[in-house]
Design a protein with these regions (language model features):
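ABC-type ATPase nucleotide-binding domains, specifically the catalytic core motifs of the NBD
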Residues: 15, 33, 75, 100-119, ...
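Helix-to-loop junction immediately C-terminal to a conserved catalytic motif
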Residues: 51
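Conserved ABC ATPase signature
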Residues: 138-142
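Helical segment within the ABC ATPase nucleotide-binding domain
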Residues: 178-192
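The feature captures the beta-strand-to-loop junction immediately N-terminal to the Walker
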Residues: 36-38
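ABC ATPase C-loop
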Residues: 155-156
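Conserved structural motif at the start of ABC-family nucleotide-binding domains
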Residues: 5-7, 20
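ABC ATPase NBD Q-loop/coupling interface
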Residues: 60-81, 226-227
Length: 243
């Protein structure tokens, strides 16, 4: 059954400050779409709009979950999660004084997820063996790379159909960035997820993205319908390749 997102002409901001200006994008079933842009251009704000954390001032956001379309605008975040959409936030935002397993179990608050806790936990430990090895270790005592794995796994505990991933490479060493991006690709293939990933690391994002968008100063400036189109675009070369 199909799971997708449509963002149509969305504007949003904080108080009198407008951050997004008539943004449109789509993520089709089982796609990985990269939302590319440097810091401060609105990527995280768009993610928050989809999750009901920030309310758009204009436009429409819909999600198709198991072939049923839902209007997300005006829904509370917990209701959006209950539909089957989960966010991996920038900065990880774990509970540092809880251990690995406790952090994971907190992710299983969606009704469908509660019914599958044992299976979901086993899948997370299979995907991320280091978490199984450290299931009783406090999250605050883990390395940055391990915390990023835990954040991804916690989102999986909600049994999502659609996964939003915000800046997964932030604060990680180059080697850990490669490992994290590889894990996201593996997740997509094994869990059949629809993924929207906001990322400023262009080179890593296009390794796994089916296509992508470039956001500049809150406006969608370019849509690349393939990896090759993204890499060959003049705006992308200027922003990311210094050409």
């Amino acid at each position: 059954m199909a799971n997708s997102i449509q963002v149509r002409e969305v504007s949003a901001g904080y108080g009198s400050v407008q951050v997004l200006d008539r943004i449109s994008l789509s993520v089709s079933d089982s796609e990985t779409v990269a939302l590319l842009g440097t810091n401060g251009n609105g990527k995280s704000t768009l993610m928050k709009c989809i999750m009901g954390i920030v309310y758009p001032s204009a436009g429409r956001i819909t999600a198709t979950i198991d072939d049923v379309e839902h209007d997300l605008c005006g829904l509370a975040t917990e209701d959006i999660v209950a539909l089957g959409i989960s966010l991996v936030p920038e900065g990880r935002r774990l509970f540092p004084r809880l251990d690995v397993e406790e952090n994971l179990l907190l992710g299983a608050h969606r009704r469908a997820a509660r019914a599958q806790i044992t299976r979901n936990l086993a899948f997370c430990f299979e995907m991320f063996p280091v978490l199984a090895q450290r299931r009783k270790q406090l999250a605050g005592n883990m390395s940055g790379g391990e915390q990023q794995m835990l954040t991804l796994a916690r989102a999986l505990m909600t049994a999502p159909r659609i996964l939003l991933i915000d800046e997964p490479s932030v604060g990680l060493s180059p080697l850990l960035v490669i490992h994290t991006i590889d894990k996201i690709r593996e997740l997509k293939e094994r869990a059949k997820l629809t993924i929207l990933m906001a990322e400023q690391n262009f080179h890593q994002a296009i390794r796994i993205a089916d296509r992508g968008y470039v956001i500049v100063h809150g406006r969608m400036e370019y849509e690349g319908r393939s990896r090759d189109q993204l890499a060959d675009n003049e705006l992308v070369r200027k922003l990311y390749l210094g050409m």
